[in-house]
């Protein structure tokens, strides 16, 4: 999950007032992402005034193949598709990169979220834009 946070900080360094919430263990009362369509994202970021919303998820290859993860990804893409500038970042092991790309593109088409910018991060190349 840290790879997603680092990516967002780097890619959106010029965005004023960017807030990043994450689901990493931390101090009590640390701000965590809110549920979106019943799912809690690993990373949720936005700025003020609102110009971008970013949702990040970290998945293993086995996770990508579960119905839960596929429903979660579809829900996040659908939510972001309703935003003016939605961004979805998915971090996976290098071996799962192709599967992740196919899954994200399939779900993005299924929910009508073609306007959502997507990025697939992996542990070797660190970044691959869809």
Where are each of the predicted segments found?
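Nuclease catalytic cores
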Residues: 1-9, 13
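Domain-level recognition of nuclease-like catalytic cores that cleave nucleotide substrates
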Residues: 91-130
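Structural motif
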Residues: 22, 58-60, 92-95
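Conserved catalytic cores of phosphodiester-cleaving nucleases, focusing on short active-site segments
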Residues: 41-69, 76
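Active-site metal-binding core of divalent-cation-utilizing nuclease and nuclease-like domains
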Residues: 14-51
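Structural beta-sheet core signal
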Residues: 55, 89-90
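Arginine/glycine-rich "motif VI" loop of SF2 helicases in the C-terminal RecA-like domain
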Residues: 77-85, 109-113
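Well-ordered, non-membrane alpha-helical segments in soluble/globular domains
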Residues: 1-4, 67-76, 100-105
């Amino acid at each position: 999950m840290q790879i997603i946070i680092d990516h967002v900080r780097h890619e959106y360094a010029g965005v004023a007032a960017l807030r990043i919430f994450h689901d990493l263990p931390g101090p009590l009362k640390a701000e965590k992402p809110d549920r979106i369509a019943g799912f809690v994202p690993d990373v949720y970021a936005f700025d003020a005034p609102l110009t971008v919303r970013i949702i990040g998820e970290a998945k293993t290859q086995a996770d990508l193949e579960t119905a839960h993860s596929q429903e979660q990804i579809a829900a996040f893409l659908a939510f972001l598709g309703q935003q003016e500038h939605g961004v979805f970042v998915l971090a996976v092991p290098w071996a799962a990169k192709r599967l992740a790309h196919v899954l994200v593109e399939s779900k993005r088409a299924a929910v009508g979220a073609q306007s959502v910018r997507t990025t697939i991060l992996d542990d070797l190349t660190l970044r691959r834009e869809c």
